């Protein structure tokens, strides 16, 4: 469902945010934007295609300016651990597996708004947290996440690939 995000009165730019899936008539535009802005993320999109996911597209003057895609999954099994539970309830997370903003649209708050949309949707879906992984060198992405309050855990994978695992807690464990 489209929602207006901002209007620039000087240039009459119309920006809207929509949720798309593979049946959306403009799905190919997302794939084209993915190929142009973040081709290294395509394997993660294709790998997760068999799981329920949500794609949020931000349109600037009716063109895909940025997107964020996440899956809702139990916390644990993705890293070969048993599902985490709290008080007998299995915890779920919104795991971001694709996020990019066209180079020409960067620096306008689009990436921040997309991240905020995921946080809002994840809360509405009953997720315990939002999780995301990013390679080192993605400083704009890191800046957005850290500015929004995500926690960060740097890590190195077996092939000496350095990255950061980001977590945004959504629910408190307070007993009060």
Spans of model-derived segments:
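Short amphipathic alpha-helix that is part of the acyltransferase structural core
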Residues: 2-43
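C-terminal "cap" of GNAT-fold acetyltransferases
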Residues: 4-12, 154-176
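Hydrophobic beta-strand residues of extracellular immunoglobulin-like
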Residues: 53-57
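Conserved acyl-donor/pantetheine-binding loop and adjacent beta-alpha core of acyl/acetyltransferases
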Residues: 61-64, 69-98
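Residue-level recognition of the GNAT/N-acetyltransferase active site
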Residues: 97, 102, 106, 133-135
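Conserved acetyl-CoA-binding loop-helix of GNAT-fold acetyltransferases
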Residues: 101, 107-120, 147
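Conserved active-site alpha-helix within GNAT-family acetyltransferase domains
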Residues: 112, 124, 136-154
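Conserved GNAT acetyl-CoA-binding A-motif
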Residues: 122-134
């Amino acid at each position: 469902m489209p929602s207006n995000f901002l209007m620039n009165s000087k240039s009459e730019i119309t920006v809207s945010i929509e949720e798309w899936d593979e049946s959306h008539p403009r799905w190919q535009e997302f794939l084209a934007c993915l190929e142009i802005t973040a081709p290294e993320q395509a394997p993660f999109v294709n790998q997760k295609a068999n799981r329920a996911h949500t794609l949020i597209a931000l349109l600037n003057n009716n063109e895909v300016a940025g997107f964020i895609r996440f899956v809702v999954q139990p916390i644990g099994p993705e890293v070969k651990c048993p599902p985490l539970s709290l008080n007998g309830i299995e915890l779920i997370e919104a795991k971001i597996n694709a996020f990019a903003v066209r180079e020409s649209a960067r620096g306008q708050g689009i990436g921040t708004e997309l991240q905020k949309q995921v946080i809002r949707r994840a809360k509405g879906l009953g997720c315990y947290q939002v999780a995301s992984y990013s390679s080192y060198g993605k400083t704009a992405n890191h800046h957005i996440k850290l500015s929004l309050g995500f926690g960060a855990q740097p890590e190195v994978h077996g092939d000496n690939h350095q990255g950061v695992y980001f977590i945004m807690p959504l629910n408190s464990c307070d007993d009060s």
